[in-house]
Amino acid sequence: NVVGIVGNAFKQTMAQLEHERVGIDRLVSNQALYELALERADRSDPRVRQEIAAIETGYRIGRILVTREVLRQAPAGFSAATKCFCTEHEIRVADFVAATFGADAMLWDDVTHGVVYAPGYTIMGGTSNIMRNILGERVLGLPREPR
């Protein structure tokens, strides 16, 4: 069985990766943990409020980016930017969760998993560095990086 056209595997793989990079899971995989952290967060601290505002803004921007991709309103190759943004956002959420729970983060399996797994988001679907290269070369038209 062949998916796509025989001899066109690389192009088919690139098309599949475009789809993988923009799934909503890129944005919301730690959202339940974030909501738990919100319950424990010290909202009297202005730095905590600032971080909450940044995360909430990130969720809104991420939803717009993912929606544009799904509706095919984004330029070709822009999924790399969406993936980078959502990945960085998920790491920010994991950092907030870890800071909010403190040492208790290591006592809850779900929290521990979310915090420890977060750096992996920069690898799945292509590393963030590769995504930046794709964005520069395919979207912005910058010259290729020397090989």
PLM regions and their residue ranges:
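Catalytic-loop motifs flanking and including active-site residues across diverse enzymes
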Residues: 9, 29, 58-61, 82, ...
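Glycine-rich beta->alpha junctions and the first turn(s) of the following alpha-helix
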Residues: 1-62, 121
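Generic, well-ordered alpha-helical scaffold segments in large soluble proteins
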Residues: 16, 36, 40, 65-68, ...
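Glycine-rich phosphate/cofactor-binding loops in nucleotide/flavin-utilizing enzymes
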Residues: 2-24, 101-147
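Generic recognition of well-ordered alpha-helical segments
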Residues: 12, 33-36, 85, 92, ...
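C-terminal helix-coil-helix/basic helical segment that borders enzyme active sites and/or dimer interfaces
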Residues: 46-49, 59-110
